[in-house]
Amino acid sequence: MGAIETQGFKLDDSGRRIVVDPVTRIEGHMRCEVNVDANNVIRNAVSTGTMWRGLEVILKGRDPRDAWAFVERICGVCTGCHALTSVRAVEDALGIRIPKNAHLIREMMAKTLQVHDHAVHFYHLHALDWVDVVSALKADPKKTSELQHLVSPSHPLSSPGYFPRRGRTGLKKFVESGQLGPFMNGYWGSKAYVLPPEANLMAVTHYLEALDLQKEWVKVHAIFGGKNPHPNYLVGGVPCAINLDGNGAAGRINMERLNFVKARIDEMIEFNKNVYLPDVLAIGTIYKQAGWLHGGGLSALNVADYGTYDKVAYDHATHQLPGGVILDGNWDEIHAIDPRDPEQVQEFVAHSWYQYADESKGLHPWDGVTEPKFELGARTKGTRTAIEHIDESAKYSWIKSPRWRGHAVEVGPLSRYILGYAHALKGNKYCQRVKEQVDFAAEAINHAIPKALGLPETQYTLKQLLPTTIGRTLARCLEGQYCGEMMLADYHELVANIRAGDTATANVEKWDPATWPKEAKGVGTVAAPRGMLGHWIRIKDGKIENYQCVVPTTWNGSPRDAKGQIGAFEASLLGTPMVNPEQPVEILRTLHSFDPCLACSTHVMSEDGRELTTVKVR
């Protein structure tokens, strides 16, 4: 390949090649290869999806009312979001509108997922890319308590005695036993970690707090959807009946269950306020002071989202996280996005292991084709079953390349927050809270926290802070906080609506396929934890004729397209300096900021296949 330029990025594969395989994700496994120059700066990145999902093919010929139960199994971590997207697609195709109670319950379930997923992602999957666990053993509990008071004065669990009891004692037992358990395979002691021991102990302690709380929060799904993971959904509404007096069938929603939900919402809000946000701000500030403002990639240029969280059901103008597309980093211009428009959302396969009749052109998901074609390029090193070095000039991924009007875009909480901030600047009253959150966080990172910690204050602009790995992690945290607040409003609206006499939770007027048109097509969208999610369905003679999912990681993890444009994963790694390529903390730090969901052991190899070290990717 040599040196080329695309989208303003310079790619050069002449340096040393490092392979991380597999990086596990929701849709399967991801492989990542990078080239580093003589200064250990990443100059080329190649993201490969190494497993074919194929659920679109499985759905053909099935009853569209059952589709949600199949597609929900795409993922057990962001559980429910595919089911919700699916029922919305079917309802859109058939012209079904759900009752107000069903809308509010679905909103609460979706926001519960966001709060839960974002907290679990940060503490249990991503924080250890920033936090040196073993260093926490050196922390002074009194200084840790003082640090906690500085960054979160209102958190009640902050006494000097709490941190040894809750965090350090258990961690010490792990280390002394020689079995680090969940902390195995880390690069503890690497110079890529810059937090002081006290910050590390604070974060490890909160890791354990989050582990306790997350199992309580998902009970909201069990109340409204019957179980977690994979709560139940229903075309036309939700499967739970309402009876505030507690009479009738078991499982009906009564005030006891609603009070339980309220208690969980309060916990979420308090945790985000007192623990999650202060931790992210403190960690982000310290790393920013160390000059770690890498990983922005496409987020500095092109971001997109369909928009979500209608304040008024079916009124997209009331989205509390409005959608759109921003191109070339121009926050002053927001392009409208329409998932129905065949010229807007298209998937390309020039570098994907699929085949189209004309691979220079993209297909809209309603016309999507999922026909596998596994072949390796001439420059591939290894065999079909043991690839050492992928050839990115040919087909190299099971992920397609979705594009918006031909542009590669980043999706996810950071994209939603950049869009929300831009909309707020234009006077959108439904997302002013986004601007408040971002302005607060920027002031804290530039001024309040440095001042409290005795560090120099800074003057970074939002365009310097947000489009970074730190900004991506911060946006996820802010979205969790916002979702908890919105969920509380949804709860009060639901209770008031029920008390006013409305107990309807489903619209079954079009449940019978005899009421359906001979042919119909629809689209459903959801703000999944990792970004904008869309399902497109075609129904013919009461059965699914075609079904296509374009998931967040398809956007972010896409390979190059016919024009040579790289995706968000690949772009985010470019220009990142590595302290030690044999301990690739920086690669994991940025990849994890996109929220890969599952965990497995991976190996880092040199170009000749020699194993350098073992990497733990979560």
UniProtKB/Swiss-Prot annotation:
The keyword Oxidoreductase applies. It catalyses: H2 + A = AH2. It is found in: Cell membrane. Its cofactor is Ni(2+). Pfam families: NiFeSe_Hases. Signal peptide: none annotated. One of its GO terms (cellular component) is plasma membrane. Gene3D superfamilies: Cytochrome-c3 Hydrogenase, chain B. It is a peripheral membrane protein. GO terms for molecular function: ferredoxin hydrogenase activity; hydrogenase (acceptor) activity; nickel cation binding. It comes from the Bacteria. Its EC number is 1.12.99.6. Binds 1 nickel ion per subunit. Keywords: Cell membrane, Membrane, Metal-binding, Nickel, Oxidoreductase. InterPro entries: Ni-dep_hyd_lsu, Ni-dep_hyd_lsu_Ni_BS, NiFe-Hase_large, NiFe/NiFeSe_hydrgnase_LSU. Ni(2+) binds at residues 75, 78, 597, 600. PANTHER family: HYDROGENASE-2 LARGE CHAIN, UPTAKE HYDROGENASE LARGE SUBUNIT. This enzyme recycles the H(2) produced by nitrogenase to increase the production of ATP and to protect nitrogenase against inhibition or damage by O(2) under carbon- or phosphate-limited conditions. Heterodimer of a large and a small subunit. Belongs to the [NiFe]/[NiFeSe] hydrogenase large subunit family. This is Uptake hydrogenase large subunit. The gene is hupB.
